[in-house]
Amino acid sequence: MKFVDEATIKVDAGDGGNGVVSFWREKFVAKGGPDGGDGGDGGDVYLEADENLNTLIDYRFNRFYNAERGKNGSGGNCTGKRGEDITLKVPVGTRAIDIDTGEKVAELMTHGMKQMVAKGGWHGLGNTRFKSSVNRAPRQKTLGTKGEVRELRLELLLLADVGMLGLPNAGKSTFIRAVSAAKPKVADYPFTTLIPSLGVVRARGNKSFVVADIPGLIEGAADGAGLGVRFLKHLERCRVLLHVIDILPIDGSDPVQNALTIIDELEQYSEKVAGKPRWLLFNKTDLLLEEEADEKINEILEALAWEDRYFKIAAVSRTGTQELCDELADFMDTLPKEIQTEEEKAANKVDFMWDDYHKDAMSGKDVVTEDDWDDWDDEEDDGHVIYVRD
């Protein structure tokens, strides 16, 4: 199946049903009082994470989704039926962005997680709600509100512990083939990897972690060059980044400049991603003598002023790969779990429409008054009638 990690959809929550103006009619009870019922709420739109899905391809073909409208109220204090909700299944790791506002509406991280993305309209109030000691025959009602309409960009972010980045042909796919059962395509031309791939790595002590291989970056990727930043988003949930550097590029380019290009693109994309723990992997060390490889690596480290961890590997022969994986597994055990701060929770809170609608309605705002009533004498008044046998 084709891998699709981004799709645009339009969701339309159901409108609320209208309240009704009605009066009780019964033999020998000339003035039975108001009995208009409320309308029903409109249906909501939800997203639900499903571990059995791994692509958003279904939403490329069907982009429009509508929840059901609430039914209108009726006489006899009968409330209208609530509109049916609609639930859209998406892969685990999907987030929804409101295209118009840029607001993150939902982020689904675990199987079965369910979040609302569009709220149905509130029900209108019947005239019974407006009855009081000074208003015995209210002719006021409120209309149901419109359901929310949102245009959403669905983004599937891979859930991986370790993310790999580097220029095309740096050896990222070869590395993931060496340390896991994943078999991404490997060839001697740029952009062999066109879609992300995941591999499960087994380390010592029965430890394991997931590594993600994304397509290579080039200069200007943050501005859309090459495959752009479309796949950089998959690094946002990684705990550690592996920056793969080819110490002997086939095109004769400078490894230092290549490394600086990746660092610059990462910082332009996101300060948060750029601030994640990042290790350097010097690949293809088997193409040089050990002394020559060490000399070139030291030159790169000095030029980058690098003081963090680095490893020398040869992915094609698996030299140094197992030691690296063991170190990664131990290092991730020391990392604290990401805890969302109160500020981040407040920033991620989604405000839906109509939260204060009924409070405003009862205060007189948005009230509709039916002025064509003839008090109690109109035989066509939509009143509720009960026939009683003499």
UniProtKB/Swiss-Prot annotation:
Subcellular location(s) of the protein: Cytoplasm
Gene Ontology cellular-component annotations: cytoplasm
Subcellular location, principal: cytoplasm
Stored Pfam families: GTP1_OBG, MMR_HSR1
Molecular function per GO: GTP binding; GTPase activity; magnesium ion binding
Sites where the protein binds GTP: 166-173, 191-195, 213-216, 283-286, 314-316
Ranges for domain OBG-type G: 160-333
PROSITE patterns (UniProt xref): G_OBG, GTP1_OBG, OBG
Positions of Mg(2+) binding: 173, 193
EC assignment: 3.6.5.-
Keywords: Cytoplasm, GTP-binding, Hydrolase, Magnesium, Metal-binding, Nucleotide-binding
Keyword Isomerase: no
Cofactor(s) for this UniProt protein: Mg(2+)
GO BP terms in the entry: ribosome biogenesis
InterPro entries registered for this protein in UniProt: G_OBG, GTP-bd, GTP-bd_Obg/CgtA, GTP1-OBG_CS, GTP1_OBG_dom, GTP1_OBG_dom_sf, OBG_GTPase, P-loop_NTPase
Domain Obg: 1-159
Quaternary data: Monomer.
Family: Belongs to the TRAFAC class OBG-HflX-like GTPase superfamily. OBG GTPase family.
Role of this protein: An essential GTPase which binds GTP, GDP and possibly (p)ppGpp with moderate affinity, with high nucleotide exchange rates and a fairly low GTP hydrolysis rate. Plays a role in control of the cell cycle, stress response, ribosome biogenesis and in those bacteria that undergo differentiation, in morphogenesis control.
NCBIfam families in alphabetical order: Obg_CgtA, PRK12297.1, PRK12299.1
Full protein name: GTPase Obg
Lineage of source species: Bacteria, Pseudomonadati, Pseudomonadota, Gammaproteobacteria, Vibrionales
